[in-house]
């Protein structure tokens, strides 16, 4: 095996948007591998909130000062992309047992397609276990404050997408008149 190949890992995803869970895993992956490519998926069955260019740009901004971490768009089969880039490792994160079955199936299929490409799993840091891009978008779209759960540049972009400032939570009364009929709080 070529000595350089074991030093490069590909971390794929849609990153719509990039979360602090992703950032943590990428940084930890960089501690293991000489280089990590953050591979932003062009082809996705999901309808992204952010365009491919926006997702790539946001990730580039986050990792601009991180030596050994690069961001690239990719399309097609991940194992083909990894092979073209000279990587024999796909880096994946696991949040919970529920992630394992799907990730295990993907790893087996990738291994079947390209035997020399290995999948390495890292457990997500405990403080990010409940975070996913889908949950972040849902909370932000309803006015939830997701500051600290995504990088600052992503936070600003989400505010732009959903309106600045975030809209009030529609479940809250806009007037205190409705509260007058309620018993006082304990």
Swiss-Prot record:
NCBIfam families: coaD_prev_kdtB, cyt_tran_rel. CDD domains: PPAT. Pathway: Cofactor biosynthesis; coenzyme A biosynthesis; CoA from (R)-pantothenate: step 4/5. Its main location: cytoplasm. Belongs to the bacterial CoaD family. SUPFAM superfamilies: Nucleotidylyl transferase. GO terms for cellular component: cytoplasm. Its EC number is 2.7.7.3. HAMAP family: PPAT_bact. It catalyses: (R)-4'-phosphopantetheine + ATP + H(+) = 3'-dephospho-CoA + diphosphate. Keywords: ATP-binding, Coenzyme A biosynthesis, Cytoplasm, Magnesium, Nucleotide-binding, Nucleotidyltransferase, Transferase. This is Phosphopantetheine adenylyltransferase. Signal peptide: none annotated. Reversibly transfers an adenylyl group from ATP to 4'-phosphopantetheine, yielding dephospho-CoA (dPCoA) and pyrophosphate. InterPro entries: Cyt_trans-like (IPR004821), PPAT (IPR001980), Rossmann-like_a/b/a_fold (IPR014729). Homohexamer. Its cofactor is Mg(2+). It is found in: Cytoplasm. It comes from the Bacteria. One of its GO terms (molecular function) is pantetheine-phosphate adenylyltransferase activity. It is an enzyme of class 2 (transferase). It comes from Nitratidesulfovibrio vulgaris (strain ATCC 29579 / DSM 644 / CCUG 34227 / NCIMB 8303 / VKM B-1760 / Hildenborough) (Desulfovibrio vulgaris). The record marks 22 as: Transition state stabilizer.
